[in-house]
Amino acid sequence: AEIGERPLTFCYPFNSYNEDVRRIVSENRIGTRIKQYAIGGEKSKSTVESLDKWVKELMISNDWGVTMIHGISTGYDAFTSPDILWEHFRRVKNQEYDIWVGTFREVAAYVKERRNVQLDIVKKESQWAVIPRLLLDKELFNEPLTMVLNKKGKGKVKVYQNGKRLLVKKTG
């Protein structure tokens, strides 16, 4: 039955899938959830400290995480106190300069784009041009990517996208 727009992401019922199912479900989708971190109460035994540890491990490994929550104050594996979740959110928010919080769709698209982007590097007289190429479907994959350039010397860096000059952020 046609029920509306086709979802661009998918999480497997009961976290159950195999490679054949994954291949079929992934077709024309940005991403499917194949990993998650269960948080909650009786089953997951989440504490503010355990959630801090999880976030720290993600940051050290330069990875991303998806939580799986079934109940906050009631329901399956509900938190022993909802304050645990709210405190976790506050702590993540306090690190927003170092942590990007996005929807599953945004993060899955960014990761896939980052893995698939190709850079063409061309020398033009005294300048270098770095031209990114992405062969993914532009309707599905349009998250802005970040490029880090390690530059030595006094030369200036100018960045253009579609003929428009972009702001360059210098760090360090």
Question: Residue spans of the language-model regions?
Answer:
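C-terminal beta-strand-rich structural cap/linker in extracellular carbohydrate-active enzymes
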Residues: 169-172
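Short acidic, S/G/P-rich loop/turn micro-motifs used as interaction or catalytic elements
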Residues: 73-75
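Catalytic cores of secreted or luminal carbohydrate-active enzymes
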Residues: 59, 78-116
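Short beta-strand segments
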Residues: 7-14, 65-71, 102-103
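Surface-exposed beta-strand/loop patches in extracellular or lumenal glycoproteins
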Residues: 133-155
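Short, well-ordered beta-strand segments enriched in hydrophobic/aromatic residues
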Residues: 119, 126-137
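Catalytic domains of cell-wall/extracellular-matrix polysaccharide-remodeling enzymes
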Residues: 1-53, 57, 78-84, 112-115
